[in-house]
């Protein structure tokens, strides 16, 4: 049948959209194939539903599929389906008009009808993905015949102001979209889309879990027997797995399948530590399959490190590294989230900040934290492995996630003076606290060895008080952000004044303490003047037993390590002076007191004060402001003793 070819103009909005599609909307030109396959999958879903509802529609639904065909010589790529197809009017309405989506209309009708049997996985809700083809094609041809009708429609456009449309005979049911591809251009990210390898790569990345088979004719060389020539054969091959493990019941998935899937999406060589399947129903429906890895990735603490969660919408891949679905401190979690309905931008590549995303994020976070809690209780060995790999990252949440802070404190573990081998929970620490103890004592520093040998530790060790030993950089941050645990506040052993005595001890030592304050008043005043550039105060210590001196901060001052971290990151840090504490029972301090009383004008006493301050600074792992001066004074002092 010969028919008239109509030439029509795009609406003004559509012309603007085409320009946006080609130059602005999509960050990756490869996305066009995802859009075409999504539309084809949508058409197959529609046909299956229509055949179920309309008993007068006699169509074969036994082999519904998507087919990809390439012609390297003609530089064409065709995506074909045997789905519902479109009529002439629908082609004009859906393709010639901006963002008019047949799928969106169908879903609205189904929702109004409340037909439970029609809960189909329809994904063509965006309405304009078809236009993405003009990013890679100079001309696009659509051939489509609606199921149950005899006449087909051919639509063709070069992406300019007009398109042509005509009625044709002898077209198969369904739709085929043929792209006349632009030349390859590496700078413009135009690849060889007739390459079998490239097509398989894109299908694997974007459409591997589409429920329908995606087929492609592939050439294979069959070696000849004897001296004959090798034979080249063409066979149809299904190039997608169709295995959306997250959509299956946990009982129907084997452990090996989970492991294989994890290695596929995480690009991992080892097995996951934990598998977390999840299905949420209600206001926001989604399915998720998450994994806790066995080992931390090398870039876990790098600024540009990637998150591990992929986002799908109705089995269609949307994006890698979807940081909006998981808090940053859980960035090590790998997996897939498949949402039923999300507000996306027109390219499906950027999520809009809306309550759906926030709701999904809350559910995922709660599920992961509950899993870690169960791991700690039921599988302590696996928990220890997890904490060694990811504990530093989890503790970041103590600062940022106030809603889940109590849960995070509960699943955290810390080194302490209670055991050299085992970590402790805060719950166990509190259970071991002494009668009358109202604070959780902690020390921060670069290593356990440095902390245990610190002068600040002496009184706590002598009196049997347990101290948390915090050696991760993040520890310097969260202890200042978390007010308390189980009604017990956190107290640094290197800040403020320490009161470890019982009421009986205080009464017994009260007169002795008053006598010491009186005896050392002159020395303390003199040293405060002599070291006024370095310290804000010199006082007697209640935390020292064997060391002559130590340096402490005010109760709410920033630790030296935290100051160094801020300076290293380029942030301004105000200059703060700390407090020098003296041990009133140490021979060096008592000798200095006596010497000061006898010859307070002796210049050597000033050097002794500087040496005492420098020794205290080094003992806590600090840095001398003038190491050369310190070593010169120390060498001169040692020379006089030889």
Curated annotation (Swiss-Prot):
InterPro entries: HATPase_C_sf, HSP90_C, Hsp90_fam, Hsp90_N, Ribosomal_Su5_D2-typ_SF. NCBIfam families: PRK05218.1. GO terms for cellular component: cytoplasm. The keyword Ligase does not apply. Keywords: ATP-binding, Chaperone, Cytoplasm, Nucleotide-binding, Stress response. Its main location: cytoplasm. Belongs to the heat shock protein 90 family. Residues 1-348 are annotated as: A. It holds the Pfam family HATPase_c_3. Homodimer. Residues 565-642 are annotated as: C. This is Chaperone protein HtpG. HAMAP family: HSP90. Residues 349-564 are annotated as: B. Molecular chaperone. Has ATPase activity. GO terms for molecular function: ATP binding; ATP hydrolysis activity; ATP-dependent protein folding chaperone; unfolded protein binding. It is found in: Cytoplasm.
């Amino acid at each position: 049948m010969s028919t008239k070819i109509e030439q029509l103009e795009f609406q003004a909005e559509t012309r603007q959209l085409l320009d946006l599609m080609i130059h602005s909307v999509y960050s990756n030109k490869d996305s066009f194939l995802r859009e075409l396959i999504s539309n084809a999958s949508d058409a197959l879903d529609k046909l299956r539903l229509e055949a179920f509802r309309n008993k007068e529609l006699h169509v074969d639904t036994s082999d519904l599929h998507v087919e990809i065909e390439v012609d390297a010589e003609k530089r064409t790529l065709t995506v074909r389906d045997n789905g519902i197809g479109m009529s002439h009017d629908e082609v004009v309405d859906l393709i010639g008009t901006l963002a008019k989506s047949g799928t969106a209309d169908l879903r609205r009708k189904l929702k109004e009808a409340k037909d439970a049997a029609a809960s189909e996985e329809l994904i063509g809700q965006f309405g304009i993905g078809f236009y993405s083809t003009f990013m890679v094609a100079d001309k696009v041809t659509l051939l489509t015949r609606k199921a149950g009708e005899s006449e087909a429609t051919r639509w063709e456009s070069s992406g300019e102001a007009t398109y042509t449309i005509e009625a044709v005979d002898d077209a198969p049911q369904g739709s085929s979209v043929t792209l006349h591809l632009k030349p390859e251009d590496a700078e413009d990210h135009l690849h060889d889309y007739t390459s079998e390898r490239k097509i398989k790569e894109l299908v694997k990345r974007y459409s591997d879990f589409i429920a329908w088979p995606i087929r492609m004719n592939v050439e294979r060389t069959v070696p000849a027997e004897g001296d004959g020539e090798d034979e080249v054969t063409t066979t149809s091959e299904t190039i997608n797995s169709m295995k959306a493990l997250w959509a299956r019941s946990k009982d129907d998935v084997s452990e090996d399948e989970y492991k294989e899937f994890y290695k596929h999406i995480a690009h991992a060589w080892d097995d996951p530590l934990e598998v977390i399947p999840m299905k949420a129903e209600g206001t926001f429906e989604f399915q998720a399959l998450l994994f806790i890895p066995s080992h931390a990735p090398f870039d876990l603490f790098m600024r540009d490190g990637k998150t591990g969660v992929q986002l799908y919408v109705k089995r269609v891949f949307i994006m890698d590294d979807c940081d909006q679905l998981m808090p940053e401190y859980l960035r090590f979690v790998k997996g897939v989230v498949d949402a039923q309905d999300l507000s996306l931008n027109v390219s499906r590549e950027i999520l809009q900040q809306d309550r759906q995303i926030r709701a999904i994020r809350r559910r995922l976070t709660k599920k992961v934290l509950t899993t870690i809690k169960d791991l700690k209780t039921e599988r302590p060995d696996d928990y220890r492995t997890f904490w060694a790999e990811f504990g530093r990252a989890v503790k970041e949440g103590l600062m940022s996630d106030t809603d889940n802070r109590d849960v995070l404190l509960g699943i955290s573990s810390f080194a302490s003076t209670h055991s050299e081998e085992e970590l402790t929970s805060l719950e166990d620490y509190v259970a071991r606290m002494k009668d009358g103890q109202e604070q959780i004592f902690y020390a921060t520093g670069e290593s356990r060895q440095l902390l245990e040998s610190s002068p600040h530790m002496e009184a706590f060790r002598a009196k049997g008080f347990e101290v948390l030993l915090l050696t991760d950089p993040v520890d310097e941050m969260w202890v200042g952000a978390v007010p308390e645990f189980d009604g017990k506040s956190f107290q640094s052993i290197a800040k403020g004044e320490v009161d470890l005595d019982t009421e009986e001890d205080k009464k017994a030592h009260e007169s002795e303490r008053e006598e010491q304050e009186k005896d050392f008043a002159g020395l303390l005043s003199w040293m405060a003047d002599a070291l006024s550039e370095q310290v804000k105060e010199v006082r007697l210590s209640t935390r020292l037993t064997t060391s002559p001196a130590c340096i402490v901060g005010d109760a709410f001052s920033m630790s030296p390590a935290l100051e160094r971290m801020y300076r290293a990151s380029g942030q301004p840090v105000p200059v703060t002076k700390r407090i020098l504490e003296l041990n009133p029972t140490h021979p060096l301090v008592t000798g200095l007191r006596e010497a000061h009383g006898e010859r307070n004008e002796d210049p050597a006493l000033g050097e002794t004060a500087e040496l005492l301050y420098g020794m205290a600074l080094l003992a806590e792992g600090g840095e001398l402001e003038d190491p050369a001066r310190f070593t010169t004074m120390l060498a001169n002092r040692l020379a006089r003793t030889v």
